[in-house]
Regions:
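RNA substrate-binding interface of SAM-dependent RNA methyltransferases
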Residues: 46, 100-193
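Short acidic-hydrophobic, aromatic-tinged amphipathic segments that line or gate anion-handling sites
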Residues: 4-8, 76-81, 167-176
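Active-site/ligand-binding-proximal alpha/beta "capping" segment
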Residues: 187-227
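Glycine/small-residue-rich loop that forms an oxyanion/phosphate-binding "nest" at active or ligand-binding sites
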Residues: 69-102
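Short, aromatic/basic amphipathic alpha-helical patches
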Residues: 62-74, 220-221
Length: 227
């Protein structure tokens, strides 16, 4: 860990982390995202997703020290003056540590037989909760369609509770998605659907399509539905 304490808001690391927390464009350009909090950073370090650097509040709890002790020697860990770190943090109460990680370069899993498709979900909390539920349910991959919220926005990452480090999350155009889903039963999760979820056969290769909070699924997504 560097012993020099960062005090300037113009510091390169501080500016970059701030941009990653607030700008989707910066996340795309830098191919990176920020994860805040001891649990998330620890999950990231254990996952194999490449960490670029960590920022730690000068005054931080013992829980943060426990995370820092797991860092490889080659990983830059920089101390940030307390007020400056608090201004950078996206949470109301700073947890004292923030990690910048590369966006995972996921590939399509072999033998795809259980996927989740999210179409036009726009609430970050809902998206993050759905991602962690997908991981818990054993989904092999989550596909995001055009118009869905940025999966690596800070509120989504927090709500995902580490799913971002373990679950492949891919944003695909409609044409590619149709090819990938060929051969799978695509179920639309619809409150007014004729088939009960208890009657659906999810043991067959399938994908579950969930629409947005306000508008449901788009016409393009509806074209994918087989059941």
């Amino acid at each position: 860990m560097t012993q020099e304490i960062i005090t300037s808001p113009q510091n390169q690391y501080v500016q970059e982390a701030r941009a990653l927390l607030s700008q989707p464009k910066a996340r795309r350009k830098l191919q990176a995202f920020a994860a805040e909090g001891a649990r998330l950073v620890e999950d990231g370090l254990r996952s194999g997703v490449r960490a670029r650097y960590l920022l730690a509040r000068t005054t931080h709890p013992a829980r943060v020290d426990a995370v820092l002790s797991q860092c490889p020697e080659t990983l830059p860990v920089l101390l940030v003056e307390d007020k400056l770190f608090d201004s950078l943090a996206d949470t109301v109460t700073s947890q004292g540590i923030l990690g910048v990680f590369e966006l995972p370069a996921w590939n399509l899993p072999d033998g795809l037989n259980f996927a989740l498709i999210l179409d036009q979900l726009r609430d970050p909390g809902n998206l993050g909760a759905t991602l962690r539920s997908a991981e818990a349910a054993g989904a092999q991959v989550v596909f995001l369609t055009p118009g869905t919220a940025d999966a690596f926005a800070p509120k989504v990452v927090r709500s995902g509770m580490g799913a971002h480090f373990r679950l492949p999350i891919l944003t695909l155009d409609w044409e590619t998605l149709a090819v990938v889903l060929a051969g799978l039963n695509v179920f639309h999760a619809d409150m007014e659907g004729e088939l009960s979820c208890w009657e659906a056969n999810f043991r067959l290769p399938c994908a579950l399509l969930i629409g947005g909070e306000a508008e449901g699924i788009s016409p393009a997504a509806a074209n994918l539905v087989t059941r």
